[in-house]
């Protein structure tokens, strides 16, 4: 993490439980990010927090640090049963829940608090086995949490800490009724520490905070500009016929170390994957139709560097902590302006530079004015020479269950640059 993203405030300056400080410092966390410096004084004083912060600002460690400290500093509810977790962290997607769990593991190891994970699509019995042994902190998605609660595998009557991460995304995905169902089965708000984090503190998010929290303090960490000054943004206007060849040519030109390509539909993502896989790229596909075990494996391979390119729908644009992404390609301009910011926010993180390349084709160019108005600036337009685009490309692969990730290792060097001036 770059020092430019840190404050002078140290974790050791707070009255945090010694085991929490020890675990943080062991992982190299000494100074707070702005959101951590704002949140911790409030949560350590027992105040509820509703925070506005983008992914990558350190909000996950802010609420994890607060959660572990609170549980270590307060006794469990009397007569607590084995199926009663003490803290509940809700996330909108399986990937985000898994990531939060991974971030929490060093703290759990240092403190002895037990973690549980609950998400749909995979691992029902494996997750249940962990819950049956008793957990202190349960991290999960709302659907699976409700499933376990209805079958009495978990009981929320002993909850002392609640975290709602990516609250705006919860609304977007239609989970608000599930959230309210879960809250109704917990102790009253004034008997819990409540934390909510969201990329935007919209009216509906504030309404949720008012409804489910105890006089929450609002804190905001706004970037100087929504897209980040370390991200180079670039825009091309291809025809529909030239769009795929332009993407492949740009990939050969840029030769990204680690790139994410976003498209607006599952079908389009599969099409892009087929072309790139046929051309020998180490490319993975991440959409809602990919089985959960395979999704996690692909994310792990991409994070380790075994895959160079990830093709994804917006399911991967929120909450995933993938380090060192050098390039983001918007094959389709998103329909939602916020999704543009979330997509390109995968690169240029923690002080690193990044490159975002968007293709404004005939179908999605109409989304551009709203995006530029939202981010507050025009995106630099670059031209290309149609005659210099790659030709004689192999026939795209067809998607099968065995072909959603990995491929041959890249060899050689990128081809000569083909873009016109």
Swiss-Prot record:
It is found in: Cytoplasm. SUPFAM superfamilies: P-loop containing nucleoside triphosphate hydrolases. A motif (DEAD box) lies at residues 165-168. InterPro entries: DEAD/DEAH_box_helicase_dom, DEAD_box_RNA_helicase, Helicase_ATP-bd, Helicase_C-like, P-loop_NTPase, RNA-helicase_DEAD-box_CS, RNA_helicase_ATP-dep_RhlB, RNA_helicase_DEAD_Q_motif. Coiled coil: none annotated. Disulfide bonds: none annotated. It catalyses: ATP + H2O = ADP + phosphate + H(+). A motif (Q motif) lies at residues 9-37. The keyword ATP-binding applies. The keyword Transport does not apply. One of its GO terms (biological process) is RNA catabolic process. ATP binds at residues 53-60. Residues 40-219 form the Helicase ATP-binding domain. Residues 245-390 form the Helicase C-terminal domain. This is ATP-dependent RNA helicase RhlB. It comes from Shigella flexneri serotype 5b (strain 8401).
